[in-house]
A protein has these predicted regions:
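Feature captures the catalytic ectodomains and active-site-proximal regions of enzymes
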Residues: 1-402
């Protein structure tokens, strides 16, 4: 087994499609990315299918795929992973949902992130929801910014509910996307979720946080959107599957929770926000230090995904270049060629759409002793011609750790 240290640089939502304003190039092709290109030049490239048919086009599915999880037996929904990331212990009869704080207007979803509500403001709003709508069986938990958690406790609650992803439904009527049961045992849960969604605006409307936001001319946070519920499951630990001790670096609970469930150490970076104002340098330093004590480091950057959902081409290019120059380049310089490394997105978020697609993502991996394949740039086009070909399932992890 390959015992060399390994780091994966994961740029959430980094892949895209050709854009006319960029002369037909993708943002990855257009951006200046010497660090990513170095990995491509010194390694082998290909593509990885991270969002197979039959599963939601969601980041937890994509990152589970990257990390070699068996979706058929291990996928449990996003909610339990978010809860694990927050340190919320779930019992066997608890059903956990991710719940977004959102902005609506005239019954339409205007912003799935509630204007990227400040974490302190979000915590106040979640506390108000708990006070007015919570009880011994219904509890809200504050996460980071708009990303929060709802836990329903009791045998009569079930994950057998169909919920839609909020970031897929900008501009849609909320009423058209209310939760519905996907199985008979989900009827009670779906009814409660609908009730919470319809009652939340009255709780939030005149909260001091929203009064201040209104006075400042900022988007109000006037609704909730629960989605992707599930019950806690058992994921096979990385140490059992690959014989490595791992660490995860991420600002968002779903990735932190996935890492925890896989037995990885969680490394918190002060100032990591999950947005373009994140602490890039702190993440780079954390990765360098983590490689001294861990075999495998998973460094996840959320910022690119967020600005892609905002459909900001300028900010997407900036976020890609910041990821490269402020994280990847300094880490590569610090660790040298002795460390195996890979770079990839978890899924595409085309700017023109502002939502996830199932297109396989580009990947480049540098593994000691493996001859480069001649690919010299990391992007959606060049990687298609790489020696790794079209990988599925745990293909990347086998390349890096087999």
């Amino acid at each position: 087994m390959n015992r060399r240290k390994t780091i994966v640089f994961l740029g959430d939502g980094m892949a895209d499609e050709p854009i006319p304003e960029l002369g037909g190039k993708t943002p990855l092709q257009f951006a200046r990315t010497p660090g990513m290109d170095q990995i491509a030049r010194e390694g082998r490239s290909g593509t990885l299918l991270t969002l197979p048919a039959g599963y939601p086009t969601s980041s937890e599915v994509a990152n589970m795929s990257v990390l070699g999880c068996d979706l058929a037996s291990e996928y449990c929904g996003r909610g339990p992973l978010e809860a694990a990331g927050r340190g919320v212990a779930l019992g066997p009869d608890d059903t956990a949902f991710r719940v977004n704080l959102v902005t609506t207007g005239e019954g339409i979803l205007r912003d799935f992130s509630g204007g990227h509500v400040a974490p302190a403001d979000a915590a106040e709003l979640i506390a108000a929801l708990n006070e007015r709508l919570g009880d011994s069986r219904v509890r809200f938990y504050a996460g980071v910014s708009y990303r929060n958690i709802l836990v329903l406790s009791g045998k009569d609650f079930s994950p057998g509910v169909r919920t839609d992803k909020p970031d897929d439904n900008h501009g849609e009527y909320v009423q058209d996307h209310l939760p519905v049961a996907s199985a008979p045992e989900g009827e009670t849960t779906a009814a409660l979720l609908r009730e919470l969604i319809l009652k939340a605006p009255a709780v939030l409307a005149d909260h001091p946080v929203n009064l201040r936001l209104r006075a400042e001319g900022k988007p109000e946070v006037n609704g909730i959107w629960p989605w992707s519920g599930g019950r806690v499951g058992a994921l096979r630990k990385l140490s059992d599957k690959y014989g490595v001790n791992g660490a995860v670096i991420s600002a968002v609970d779903v990735i932190v929770g996935l890492g925890r469930c896989l037995g990885m150490a969680v490394i918190k970076v002060p100032g990591a926000t999950g947005y373009i104002d994140t602490n890039y340098e702190g993440k780079a330093l954390a990765a360098i230090e983590a490689l001294k004590t861990h075999d495998f480091v998973y460094l996840h950057l959320e910022a690119i995904d967020e600005v892609s959902h905002e459909q900001s081409l300028k900010l997407k290019i900036q976020a890609i270049e910041d990821f490269d120059s402020r994280i990847i380049v300094p880490v590569l310089q610090a660790v040298g060629p002795a460390v195996n490394c890979a770079v990839l997105p978890d899924h595409p978020v085309p700017i023109k759409m502002g939502r996830h697609t199932r297109t396989p993502v580009p990947v480049s991996a540098r593994v000691a002793g493996v001859e480069p394949d001649g690919v010299t740039a990391f992007n959606e086009v060049d990687c298609l011609g790489g020696a790794l070909g079209g990988m599925k399932a745990d293909g990347l992890m086998r390349v890096l750790l087999a």
